[in-house]
């Protein structure tokens, strides 16, 4: 059974995550005091039910030791996993402006910007030990729920899920990446007028990149690096490995390379997911 602890900055999507987990059969509790986690787990263990509990600045323990002690008191049948949701500062400010809700730290007479920054500092101990960090800045409510449904399949099977995602450096580096590889030095299909409107998922772009030895060498050396350390990552009690591949715009080279790596590890029987951040932004609504 899984004890999913959901944390993150206010406005990042914790309520959405809890609703999605509830739909997946988790027993969900919002803002349960950390010291009561072992009691909840013991109660649910007899019923063989996984649980999800949200923790934020309102029920954050005074010291990390209190949290660690609670984790040590969990019954052996429960595997604790920590999900941390985040979003960039401007997105959080916009979401608060749209909903006109008060920030949990507003009672301290802080401006919204200061409250967001202080909350980030207070939650850092949880963020630093998170098994999975999801950046919801560009996600809709439905996209976040769908991502959780997809990713938790790997987690609940106790299998490492490899996530290969492409992105454009001009849009920023994904904050949820474990590894970031820069492919801006590879030949760029953008300069071919016929290929410019296409993406790395299209055959003509793939054929263009496939003709270049340096592209093959990069893919080979990157997958060899990941294969070298994958056994240690799999035995390190982690559930996700997010590998981000970046080019200038996130449309051609990074998409192609991410797909090649995903296909390779998928063919080796690994639990693999792929996503393309720039292409997802361009989808018609």
Curated annotation (Swiss-Prot):
Quaternary structure (record): Homotrimer.
Entry keyword Cell inner membrane: no
Official protein name in the record: RNase adapter protein RapZ
GO molecular function ontology, one term from the record: RNA binding
RNA-binding: annotated span: 266-285
HAMAP family: RapZ_like (MF_00636)
Entry's family note: Belongs to the RapZ-like family. RapZ subfamily.
Keyword field: ATP-binding, GTP-binding, Nucleotide-binding, RNA-binding
Protein residues bound to GTP: 56-59
Annotated function: Modulates the synthesis of GlmS, by affecting the processing and stability of the regulatory small RNA GlmZ. When glucosamine-6-phosphate (GlcN6P) concentrations are high in the cell, RapZ binds GlmZ and targets it to cleavage by RNase E. Consequently, GlmZ is inactivated and unable to activate GlmS synthesis. Under low GlcN6P concentrations, RapZ is sequestered and inactivated by an other regulatory small RNA, GlmY, preventing GlmZ degradation and leading to synthesis of GlmS.
Residues reported to bind ATP: 8-15
